[in-house]
């Protein structure tokens, strides 16, 4: 009888152990399961052979040693490198790299369980990626219709900041509307080109070149720009592109080569709408630099950050007609740590938060592109409020020397305070039409009726 009881007890214990083990297997997060999919879909695009990431994450053996660091970086939302605050302002963005909380929880659970591989026979298929030198929009738009290169520039292995200003023909023989645009430093130039601005100049009746407007802006880490389908961002015929390129010898970031780069070329890739597209849309978009507190001419004397101190700037802009804000890209250098965009209504006295970036970094300049159906509509007379914050203390990990006075200027060691905004210019009828459309969509959404 005692032996029978012992046998039954042993069997029960074994069954309990098997049930617990089965439950644990069901709860186990593995690389060959969800964890690897999160990494492949969000990390490998940079962390691969030839990519800009400092280590490769293409296989389990490559990922496993870095698992604890991956957990820290995704938990702190430092990776993927897309600093944009959750829960403040507009959250629907095109090209949003932020992980969903469920994806972060998956990585955390995987690492806490020892970062297991999982069933080796059920291996994760390798990610299908384009060549790192390929254009970013090639999958959805194909190859660009037009590529405009800068002149070749030699960049030394070390030394002071360098600038190049030069002109190249656009190659555009008929007015065209821009669909998308990307600036791409070639090869190792990615880590030494701080920014590359390009503007459009056209000839007047006397044959003299004059400024038409911005073509695009590039700063380190920027992915590109998408233009809404309902507007025309014009590239005029027979124009000239004025390049303004700022280079930092030796480079910034973990993949900086620290060697001389021969014949560095920066390229602009342009995806264009078909000829005559401007006749199909009613409004135009432009990209401009909006100063914050100080105009460029006074920045070098009035923008001052003391040693081991802080600074904050604030700028205000309004329009004599309604507009739509299509994208927001703050700009600064090594001491800048945060930025925001708000809209103040003089009629109501209320301020609406649009975008907040509380962990901004000079190595990743993102153009935050709002989804067209929720991009901020700004009535005539409303005020855009732009703010930026600076930290010149040792607490700022990007700060090379907190004991230095920092002034406004063009060098990497100096500071800037402005934002790039892509604006669609409306008239009152267009503004009211878009407001009405959004109210109708909101009603359909609340009523559970699908939008046509």
Label the predicted regions.
Residues 115-119, 276-280, 425-437:
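Short, charged low-complexity linker/loop segments at the C-terminal edge of domains
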Residues 22-168, 187, 194, 238-244:
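Aromatic- and Gly/Pro-enriched helix-to-coil junctions and flexible linker segments
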